[in-house]
């Protein structure tokens, strides 16, 4: 198992996630997908180093991150649906003006 290949692949995925956030500042849904891409890269790092070090803690952390990411996505998508129903858009400019 070549760690450099997996680490490079994970780094590319993480950079693509950062790039997606920085390039697209208007659509909040694409920003959420980019954050999920970054979490995927972190999970891949946890799993690769867990297998290479013969330690189960990396796999446990990866499962923990997956469950938190699933909950985050569900809550975020629910907020987006409610915002779209009330305002008619999920653009970042209009979400920033929400008060209350």
From Swiss-Prot:
A family per Pfam: Oxidored_q2
InterPro entries to which the protein is assigned, alphabetical: NADH_UbQ_OxRdtase_chain4L/K, NUOK/Mnh_C1-like
Record-level Gene Ontology MF annotations: NADH dehydrogenase (ubiquinone) activity
Protein's GO biological process: ATP synthesis coupled electron transport
NCBIfam families the record matches: PRK05715.1-2, PRK05715.1-3, PRK05715.1-5
Quaternary context: Complex I is composed of at least 49 different subunits.
Protein's name according to its UniProt entry: NADH-ubiquinone oxidoreductase chain 4L
Lineage of origin: Eukaryota, Viridiplantae, Streptophyta, Embryophyta, Tracheophyta
Gene for this chain: ND4L
């Amino acid at each position: 198992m070549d760690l450099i290949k997996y680490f490079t692949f994970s780094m590319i995925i993480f950079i693509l996630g950062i790039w997606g956030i920085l390039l697209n500042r208007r659509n909040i849904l694409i920003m959420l997908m980019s954050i999920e891409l970054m979490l995927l890269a972190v999970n891949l790092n946890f799993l690769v180093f867990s297998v290479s070090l013969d330690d189960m803690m990396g796999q446990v952390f990866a499962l923990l991150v997956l469950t938190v990411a699933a909950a985050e996505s569900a809550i975020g998508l629910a907020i987006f649906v409610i915002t779209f129903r009330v305002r008619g858009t999920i653009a970042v400019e209009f979400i920033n003006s929400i008060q209350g």
